[in-house]
Swiss-Prot record:
Keyword vocabulary terms for this entry: Amino-acid biosynthesis, Arginine biosynthesis, ATP-binding, Cytoplasm, Kinase, Nucleotide-binding, Transferase
Gene: argB
E.C. numbers: 2.7.2.8
Transport listed as a keyword: no
Protein residues bound to substrate: G45, G46, R67, N159
Sites marked Transition state stabilizer: K9, K218
Protein name, as recorded: Acetylglutamate kinase
Amino acid sequence: MNQRPLVIKLGGAVLSSIDTLTLLFKTISNYQQQAKRSLIIVHGGGYLVDELMAKLQLETIKKEGLRVTPKDQIGYITGALAGTANKMLQGQAMKNNVKAIGLSLADGGLCQITQLNPELGNVGLATAGDAKVLEAILATQVTPIISSIGITNDGELMNVNADQAAVAVATALDADLVLLSDVPGVLDAEKQLIKSLDSAQAEMLIHQAVITDGMIVKVRAALDAAQELGRAIEVASWRSPEKLAELFIGNSIGTQFQPQ
């Protein structure tokens, strides 16, 4: 049995679908009872941020799928991701008999955070840090739910792309990684699922504008993870929670990204 921890990145509109979250956490609960494998959830919550920005009448700007985060907005975004989104997921976990703890990338020095690009504002780049605290939590059989908010060594709050954050967490733990999103995986020009993809094939599809916008970030994060971890990384959909048990035991249900 594979005892390597599994990092599950949750993103997209899944946070707005209570029915899907119920099925997801029931699947996780059933799986953990059988497999005794450590699961870690890393999440974003872009739709919550979009809703908040609209209410505050603040403009949302994205560059290559990354949210531009002015310093005067990082407090709002931290509240939406590390607050509302994180506690909502923790609540759904508890409701479905999954013991959970809400964390951020900064807790216990789990990830090192630097500013990605000054033009993007308070957008951070996460790299693997010290996983000792997270490993101690996992030893208690509690499921960590980690928001994609990080803190630099200078104490600056940073909004980290959740896919990239999940890569850093998986690297810190030497864990397997699954990126769950709104889409079933990477689709070709005919909208058919691509079962397997390497870096050269992905760059060609980006050049051909088959892979666009936020999917570019997701694809590059998955390829980086595959390279860094030295094993295939999966991108799949959360829309079919009944298939996730297959994924947890190592069967592919989406697109697998291969290391070079």
